[in-house]
């Protein structure tokens, strides 16, 4: 049986990532990223609560990329998002990017809040 390419039905997958950047639909985004099926936008981190609250009704699950390693979400954030109907799962940024693409290809209402990966940021 030949492997099947994932289908995204017009949604925005993460094409690639590296130290300090993400590639979405051929465009490079530097720094943090907030993405769901219909939009990708710069994100400054967990202090930007308005952007996370705006996901209510658009996503059921928010994958939180915490950088190179898994870490706890800021205190109270998970409870606040759950009250809005958004389940939040912290994991490393690399894991969050991969899981986002898999769930998106399944047609799930998923988003990702991704802190950039550490390391030297390419200039070109």
Swiss-Prot record:
Could you tell me what this protein does? Not required for the biogenesis of c-type cytochromes.
What is the protein named?
Answer: Uncharacterized protein RCAP_rcc01784
> Which source organism does the UniProt entry give?
Rhodobacter capsulatus (strain ATCC BAA-309 / NBRC 16581 / SB1003)
Q: Do you know which InterPro entries this protein is assigned to?
A: MTH938-like_sf, NDUFAF3/AAMDC
Q: Name the Gene3D superfamilies on file.
A: MTH938-like
Covalent S-S links between cysteines: none
| One of the Pfam families matching this protein, by short name | DUF498
